[in-house]
Amino acid sequence: MTTRYIFVTGGVVSSLGKGIAAASLAAILEARGLNVTIMKLDPYINVDPGTMSPTQHGEVFVTEDGAETDLDLGHYERFIRTKMNRRNNFTTGRIYEEVLRKERRGDYLGATIQVIPHITNAIKEKVLAGGEGHDVAIVEIGGTVGDIESLPFLESIRQLGVELGRDRTLFMHLTLVPFLGAAGEVKTKPTQHSVKELRSIGIAPDVLVCRGDRAIPANEKAKISLFCNVEERAVISLKDVDSIYKIPALLRSQGLDDLVVKRFGLECREADLSEWENVIYQEANPNGEVVIGMVGKYIELPDAYKSVNEALKHAGLKNRVSVTIKYIDSQTVEAKGEEVLQGLDGILVPGGFGERGVEGKILAAKFARENNLPYFGICLGMQVALIEFARNVAGMADAHSTEFNKETPFPVVGLITEWIDEEGNVEQRHEASDLGGTMRLGAQLCHLLDGSKAAQAYKGNSCVERHRHRYEVNNKYRERLEQAGMIFSGLSSDRKLVEMIELKDHPWFVAGQFHPEFTSTPRDGHPLFEGFIAAASAHQKRDLK
């Protein structure tokens, strides 16, 4: 199979939405029957985002094969059916790590290792390998043109453009076209300078996607075309919209997919965007609203919970309600108590690391349990629910996780001492182990208890979900917790590890050790999130009565 490559760059400012634009184009091409994948090349020196602060970088998206990746891969999976893997995201740090490892082994036969050709060759190899088996591979280059960190990646795709030829490569550049209120017009000069910068390193864009708060007038498109040496039909206006799921139709209406297909000489059907039209209709026509309190510790940056936010919205679509997320700092719960949890239709406690704010999450679980409020715990959200239950129901007053209190008399949650690395090797973990790459990661089979809410949600006796954690429920206390009324509704493939818990005599109190948000999509939703929002809606209706 001959793979075609679309390289996506960004200029003027960061956060223009390259990932959303790339994913939206991929969605249109997929709707035309093409097999599409998307890659993200990140210029930072970290080997992967696994140890980066969520408040700086946003969430870490985990792929099925256990790679810790950029949150943009979450966008990719929500827009197209192709599942991402570790070949879809790599960083400057990973490239340098692999090149230096080869140098230490002597693979380069004593050559002087340089950015060109050794680093650029390694990047090109990754890009070509990631595109294998697909009709089209869209490659997003992180950062902004002009950043020193991005230069090796830009040089690599420049070389690929020459080596593969125009019939297999296309360069798409996102820029900002701001509107100046004082002048009463949009300004194209930033775009002109951005394209000039890109051309100075040898890349001539074939398509310009112009971001702004409004559509670009035809005369300004003609001006951009003239000064940037791009066909006028290849100047695409991408205005702000109230839903990112409208963007595929917006790009389709301007013929971007036709331009790509013609450029690559591909024969394929017209795009069928009916599934996306249905998503947009559901989003615009809810029959009600629910308020979900998300009790977390990284709430100053909503992108830290990007997939959870989107999964809640998807569940709202399936239940025909709009979901309003109320972000609640878990430390605020510690300081003010239950008053900050009033007026909610459900509580969700997402994952997290470290002791800060954990008691606030435990209080949130207690409030939901005692007030029959729908509760959904994810990863740490399951662990705090179990700790709360152990303390206040099962008679273990000082129960805790050894992550937060190594001297607790009731360590109901403890460190996993054995794990499997990305190469499939069994490794031993201890307190001094590295933080990076030492977690239980990726898709794992989970057996579900017959008759449980989990089994009802999944409509079956098993599921496969993605994990990212290094602490588990301590089996020593399982029997005591079960006797107190806790249901262990999900177990690992070998039935040795607890994956899900529920509570008897509660409308909907469900928690999982895994991260179901990573597999939720706007077209398909996710059964656990759907069940949670359905329970929140039912709780609201009971309150109204």
Swiss-Prot record:
Entry-linked InterPro entries: Class_I_gatase-like (IPR029062), CTP_synthase (IPR004468), CTP_synthase_N (IPR017456), GATASE (IPR017926), GATase1_CTP_Synthase (IPR033828), P-loop_NTPase (IPR027417)
Domain Glutamine amidotransferase type-1: 291-542
Enzyme class: ligase
Means of activity regulation: Allosterically activated by GTP, when glutamine is the substrate; GTP has no effect on the reaction when ammonia is the substrate. The allosteric effector GTP functions by stabilizing the protein conformation that binds the tetrahedral intermediate(s) formed during glutamine hydrolysis. Inhibited by the product CTP, via allosteric rather than competitive inhibition.
Chain sites annotated for binding UTP: 14, 187-192, 223
Any one Gene Ontology cellular component term annotated for this protein: cytosol
Alphabetically ordered keywords of this record: ATP-binding, Glutamine amidotransferase, Ligase, Magnesium, Metal-binding, Nucleotide-binding, Pyrimidine biosynthesis
Catalyzed reaction equations: UTP + L-glutamine + ATP + H2O = CTP + L-glutamate + ADP + phosphate + 2 H(+); L-glutamine + H2O = L-glutamate + NH4(+); UTP + NH4(+) + ATP = CTP + ADP + phosphate + 2 H(+)
Record pathway: Pyrimidine metabolism; CTP biosynthesis via de novo pathway; CTP from UDP: step 2/2
Similarity comment: family membership: Belongs to the CTP synthase family.
Further facts: CTPSs have evolved a hybrid strategy for distinguishing between UTP and CTP. The overlapping regions of the product feedback inhibitory and substrate sites recognize a common feature in both compounds, the triphosphate moiety. To differentiate isosteric substrate and product pyrimidine rings, an additional pocket far from the expected kinase/ligase catalytic site, specifically recognizes the cytosine and ribose portions of the product inhibitor.
Protein name, per record: CTP synthase
Gene giving rise to this polypeptide: pyrG
